[in-house]
Amino acid sequence: MTMQTITAVSGNDDAATHGAAAPPGGALLSLDGITVTFPGVRALDAVSLSVRAGEVHGLMGENGAGKSTLLKVLSGVNQPQAGTLTLNGTVQRFASTRAALEAGIAIIYQELHLVPELTVAENLMLGQLPSRLGVVDERALAVRALDALERLGEHIDPDIPVKYLSIGQRQMIEIGKALMRDARVIAFDEPTSSLSARETTQLFRIIRSLRAEGRAIIYVTHRMEEVDALCDRVTVFRDGRRIETFESVAELDRDQLIGCMVGRSIEDVYGYRPRAAGDVMIEAKGLTGPGLSEPVSFAARRGEIVGFFGLVGAGRSELMKLLYGATRPSGGHVELGGKRVAFSSPRHAVRAGIALCPEDRKQEGIVAIASVADNLNISARRHFSPARVLLDARRERDLAQRYIERLAIKTPDGDTPIGALSGGNQQKVVLARWLAERIDVFLMDEPTRGIDVGARAEIYNLFYELAEAGRTVILVSSDLAEVIGVSDRIIVMKEGRIAGEVAKAQATPDALIKLALPR
């Protein structure tokens, strides 16, 4: 089966706007009354949905809303107990992923389904390798692979193993696989979660090209800005049901969208709770180091949530690492509770009462293959086993269970690998780890990135509880609504220095952006 041509889209092309999209055609894919049940759970409850040819249809909802189950129905992984799936006018029922692919439906999952040891060309043609007399036709394979890569706009050697490619390049190979099978419906599951800004731009160009060809695109995301940039319509799921389909993204009311997702208003999501601040808990005096262009000075009090806002490269994450002892300052110092401190490592910072929830949660915050209990106990373990020879399994199990219940961490049990949890529940485990350490200062670097709205509300409530208990929370966030909605005051950084501070009452998007923009 040959791959159809993908129309090239330049960075300045008008197709980047909604108005330039190809007019949507009739429904290419229709779901009517789809119901999927598991023991004790109704994952999809009589869901009806249509996706048109030539549109990008966004799917939004909290984790557990039913989006992933819907994709599994489309791909043949799950078979519904009721309802019908109609593709291009024909009722279909897929008994396997192969059947769905052959019918023309492809899913691009977050966890890419490539074989790392095989070459780019072999992955592109997986399951349909060209052969002659029972032997792979290497020449035909190379020609088809080069053709596919050229049409995707990717300059990749087709003979190198996929394991050497970036995440963005691997994702392009997945898209190429779908097009090699001439998929007319392509679903993307949180595709930008691990991509750089450049890779995201390239992905959007490809998706717009696919839309212009008349393919039906399903786009699952938590990110409002991606819906604005890419989608024609958006459907919201909650608790296994389709709540509403918004017919025009250009006229979308964000507050209404969030309300549909979580079942409450946007004010309830942030739920700001004012409180009195106490004495200064942490203070930086003339701090300099990697990522800072000028000496940085600021103070944060007990019971206070201090927001740090800035654009990419402003120096916020670098400042947090200096406070945490992950990097060494070249000048200035830090005071904790009025006493001068100097940390040679994060371990020393933790023992003094400072903890960091890092920006890259998956790489720096958790051990993905370890259990929830092991991740939670990583730091507290030294209290249970001073000699560091024998582990106290019972105490560790009890501690894990206590915090699983206290923070309402959604996991079957403490032995579940943390990598199997949603982003919001992974972040709760990281927070629980530090709660078990009696931390005074919580450095939260982009704590809700990639987390759905409902889980965000739960994490914000944890911040308020910490502040009400006299702890200090420093919130680094690129989300304007979040940093304004949660913080007591906001410090804005720009080009490695503090550009200004904004009080709660004066905090508006315009005020923060004006301070954050480069000269």
UniProtKB/Swiss-Prot annotation:
It is found in: Cell inner membrane. It catalyses: L-arabinose(out) + ATP + H2O = L-arabinose(in) + ADP + phosphate + H(+). Its main location: membrane. Pfam families: ABC_tran. Keywords: ATP-binding, Cell inner membrane, Cell membrane, Membrane, Nucleotide-binding, Repeat, Sugar transport, Translocase, Transport. SMART domains: AAA. One of its GO terms (molecular function) is ATP binding. It is a peripheral membrane protein. Its EC number is 7.5.2.12. Signal peptide: none annotated. One of its GO terms (cellular component) is plasma membrane. The keyword Glycosyltransferase does not apply. Residues 29-264, 264-515 form the ABC transporter domain. ATP binds at residues 61-68. It comes from the Bacteria. InterPro entries: AAA+_ATPase, ABC_carbohydrate_import_ATPase, ABC_transporter-like_ATP-bd, ABC_transporter-like_CS, P-loop_NTPase. Part of the ABC transporter complex AraFGH involved in arabinose import. Responsible for energy coupling to the transport system. NCBIfam families: PRK11288.1 (NF008442). PANTHER family: ARABINOSE IMPORT ATP-BINDING PROTEIN ARAG, CARBOHYDRATE TRANSPORT ATP-BINDING PROTEIN MG119-RELATED. Belongs to the ABC transporter superfamily. Arabinose importer (TC 3.A.1.2.2) family. The complex is composed of two ATP-binding proteins (AraG), two transmembrane proteins (AraH) and a solute-binding protein (AraF). This is Arabinose import ATP-binding protein AraG 2. The lineage of its organism: Bacteria, Pseudomonadati, Pseudomonadota, Betaproteobacteria, Burkholderiales.
